[in-house]
């Protein structure tokens, strides 16, 4: 049991004033009546196997919304839809890489304003459950940890007591994140009731490091105080729970549809004989991967499973309630058992779609929750109107070669990784010369390319290498003195398991007919840095740029579309790139993410209303492989009102 009482640097207790719906909620000094002080508290009642909130039995029904997958302008809308479904809490993970993309540079404003997200939830009457990591998985690049850990320490053992890892983790959590969270804890007047440490750590089984997890526990207790409820989550498998359990931290489980909740909770009871039953990840859908079919879960099955969990008086978090989007190039990848990258969309077949619309799951879920918790009165959320902004004519404005020519080049005898070149995501152009006479054809071997490479010899297209397809060799025709160029794309670092030290680029030496190639010039192309993007010359007399390849690949294309001035505000819309192959899209210099309709299942990209403006807007594509029209004819893309996430796939 957690102790009750006052604490804090100023020695006062705090209490949440009861406010009307939608009103700002702030921390206030506790009021004293006849020498009685009301102290806000949230704790575990082990004797009666329940949570207590201010001394009263409590169970949470929460939904996962990742603030970094939703633009800040839409946080109130998504959280309101969660509350109107009867949920009383929101769960979110906190991504280290979002807030410290470069070592020592911290971002906590705008779309990264974590504290504002938490306060918005509080204003809407939602409690908050935080998952602080430092590893979060969530199908994010490197599981949400920053790439520069690999840059600084190539041999670092992530998620362990490796001193290098602990040093950076301690600074991030102990000096930056946790002090920001403390004032938002429930006992301090905020909405944060629980904090999760790590994520499914037990799935590593024999790789688990108890010194690390105890260190994480102690650091969190030191910075947040002794009374905050800490918890872990693991698969309901004995080995996973045994390895993931941290002494003094409450162990919860996660499972989706098709599982018997009674049997699953028996697993939790093996490690928590007393305390609340808690499924902290009840899956509403599942993740997608490029080239594999789109995952869905039947709404009736999902609702019945939720009902069965709640009937046991368990607490539950629905993962995801609203999935959102991995904007930019932040999506991760997995080994299944071969490499597979996650798409830009994180729709997850959730009750609220990527664009913020209630799906066919919303009302059945709401009906189930209403049996156990009061559902707020008010209008039931409805789908919003979408923009049909039509065809966008796109003209080639620069080749990748032109853009790269303005960027610095690094020379080294051996090929360097993205991390060694201080590049998080994007492209690296590797070039070397053939120093000797070779047979015709010769075999160029690029073992362990991470992840996809476009090969050129003497300026001519010579083929492709692919980690996903296990294609690491190319037969080339070259003469002594020819330049070999390889453009390597990162498709997202592995987000789970023992392979998250996922270096990108040419990660081992390249050979030509068995001879190691030396002397490399390398140009890092940081596609998330808008300052490197080419400007569009809007003069109608401007001639299209020469494409980077004869097929129109490795080329930037730009065009404009109009949002009518008479519209009160822009509308959500979806970018369709029929005929285009693979690349990256920006609207008004905001990076929507990767597109790859050739392999599916994601065909369209979500374009949020808040990045648009009335009048002219710019669409920019970097096509990596082939455009749907021969130069110099203009190509086109379309902005439509339908999202397509279940397109055809090769397998």
Residue ranges and their predicted role:
Residues 5-27:
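Cleavable N-terminal signal peptides of Sec/SRP-targeted secreted and luminal proteins
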Residues 33-35, 39-73, 80-84, 105, ...:
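Extended substrate-binding grooves/exosites of carbohydrate-active enzymes
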Residues 66-84, 103-123, 211, 438-444, ...:
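Aromatic- and glycine-enriched glycan-recognition loops and surfaces
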Residues 75-143, 147, 217-228:
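Aromatic-lined substrate-binding rim segments of carbohydrate-active enzymes
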Residues 90-97, 131-140, 193-198, 234-236, ...:
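Short, solvent-exposed turn/loop segments enriched in Gly/Ser/Thr/Pro and often Arg
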Residues 166-181, 188-197, 202-204, 209-213, ...:
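Carbohydrate-binding surfaces of carbohydrate-active enzymes
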Residues 189-274:
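Gly/Pro-rich turn-and-neighbor structural signature
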Residues 440-456, 484, 561-588, 595-596, ...:
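Aromatic-lined ligand-binding clefts that engage carbohydrates, nucleic acids, or primary amines
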